[in-house]
Swiss-Prot record:
InterPro entries: Membr_insert_effic_factor_YidD (IPR002696)
Function: Could be involved in insertion of integral membrane proteins into the membrane.
Membrane topology classification: Peripheral membrane protein
Name recorded for this polypeptide: Putative membrane protein insertion efficiency factor
Amino acid sequence: MKRALTSVVLAPRNAAIAVISLYRRVVSPIYGDVCRYYPSCSAYGLEAVQEHGLVHGGVLAAWRVCRCHPWAEGGIDDVPARRVQQYRRTRLGFVVAPSHGKG
């Protein structure tokens, strides 16, 4: 029951991850490597949402996009690490409840 509830709670986060991933695969290659920061803004947004959730990660990503403009100095700008990892990431980047080994 708890695992099902966790999946429901994580659904909006995973929906945002799917949208950002789709953008990275379809739209981002059209523009090429134009971001002044490393990782790129879309990679930063993806990691921020994976790491911090939809609201806090979305705010971090929006702030990053606002800072990325032609006159920005750029450089390395990693997503702030979370103190405690609550969830794990799948191979496709979605966030799921941690699996606990049973025996």
